[in-house]
Design a protein with these regions (language model features):
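Short catalytic/signature loops enriched in Gly
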Residues: 4-5, 14-17, 156-160, 250-358
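Conserved structural motif at the start of ABC-family nucleotide-binding domains
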Residues: 19-21, 38, 101
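P-loop NTP-binding/switch modules centered on Walker-like glycine-rich loops
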Residues: 56, 191, 195, 199-280
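Conserved ABC transporter NBD signature motif
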Residues: 77-89
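Conserved ABC ATPase "signature" region
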Residues: 89, 140-160, 269-270
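A short, proline-enriched helix->beta-strand linker immediately N-terminal to the Walker B motif
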Residues: 184-188
Length: 358
């Protein structure tokens, strides 16, 4: 019988836990009442590795990231759970204590670089701010550090460009500046929220390569938020698949993508048109995700699931172990485990930027 336990990853190589999220709940206040937008989300990010939060728009990926970083909008609040950064629960700390812990140890890269940067300050000033606040440097010292950061992330002529404003940079260069800001204090954890949004394919490849290099140089944990299965296949070690505010499957990318044990994950993988034949109908998941204010009783995926049964409408499945370090929230995950003899080939999921580099 499959266990309902959720143990830490057990591997021969010892992994150091940087971030452990357990049972995270996030609520939003609306004119019609409180809406649960993140529900009992749990995952672990390890030093030197990348965990991907994967799912459709509105599934709760970015809200989860904001809750971890303490950047929720005023109408949103953490309603429960533990966010432990290097063993310290950020949810139990006041604002000042949280900044002291998370400020130097956690960096975040937002998806819209133009709006994330302040238009009235030079990029050198903005990059140097972290050094002035957390390292006590003066303006001259901070500027030198900012220039070195710009050089490190591949911005040409950093001594000159440090005096430029955000609008004077291309989209790709602005994203590099955001990444530089995020890693300025050598954080233990980097959250990258859709870091290649609105960038062309070539620039996407460059940004992902930069993040990969910085992760290796700093030996930091990375939480990568994306809806792109190809990016997950190439960049992540582990994946947590989210749907309607819930993690429905979690495990090593190679395992989850080759033998998914949740119908939603399986549907996503089958929707990739890698092996599509011209003229044939493309595979897709019918319907739309439920409105978060009207989540049905039972399984959150029931209205779109080809395996739905009476129990799915009555009882919400808990995450349970389906394989080594793999967990699925499905009443019929054992059926999918049996079907894994004909697995989806994760090597067939290739990102455009990978093909561009061939």
């Amino acid at each position: 019988m499959m266990e309902l336990l959720d143990p830490q990853r057990s591997t021969e190589k010892t992994l150091t836990t940087v971030l452990a999220v357990t049972g995270l709940d996030v609520d939003i206040r609306t004119p019609t009442g409180t809406v649960r937008v993140v529900n009992k989300v749990s995952f672990t990010a390890y030093q030197g590795q990348t965990l991907a939060l994967l799912g459709e728009s509105g599934c709760g990926k970015s809200m989860t990231a904001k809750a971890i970083a303490g950047l929720l909008d005023p109408v949103a609040s953490v309603a429960g759970g533990v966010v432990a950064l290097e063993g310290k629960d950020l949810n139990t700390m006041g604002a000042r204590a949280r900044r002291a812990v998370a400020g130097p140890s956690l960096g975040i890269v937002f998806q819209d670089a133009l709006t994330a940067l302040n238009p009235v300050y030079t990029v050198g000033t903005q990059l140097g701010e972290a050094f002035r606040i957390h390292r006590g440097m003066n303006k001259k010292q901070a500027r030198l550090q900012a220039i070195e950061l710009m050089r490190r992330v591949g911005i040409p002529e950093p001594e000159v460009r440090a005096s430029a404003y955000p609008h004077q940079f291309s989209g790709g260069m602005r994203q590099r500046i955001l990444i530089a800001m995020a890693v300025a204090l050598s954080p233990r954890l980097l959250i990258a929220d859709e870091p290649t949004t609105a960038l062309d394919v070539t620039v996407q490849a460059q940004i992902m390569a930069l993040l990969r290099r910085l992760r290796e140089e700093e030996n930091m944990a990375v939480v990568l938020i994306t809806h792109d299965l190809a990016v997950v296949a190439e960049e992540a070690d582990d994946v947590a698949v989210m749907y309607a505010g819930n993690v429905v499957e979690r495990g090593p990318v190679a395992t989850v993508f080759s033998a998914p044990t949740h119908p939603y994950t399986k549907g996503l993988l089958e929707s990739v048109p890698t092996h599509a034949v011209r003229g044939d109908e493309l595979s897709s998941i019918p319907g739309s995700p439920p409105e978060l204010k009207n989540i049905p009783a039972g399984c959150v995926y029931q209205d779109r699931c080809p395996m739905v049964a009476a129990i799915c409408r009555e009882t919400r499945p808990e995450l349970r172990q389906t394989g080594e370090n793999q967990f699925s929230a499905c009443h019929f995950s054992d059926v999918l485990v049996t079907q894994a003899g004909n697995p989806t080939n994760d090597h067939s999921i290739t990102s455009p930027q990978h093909e561009e580099n061939q």
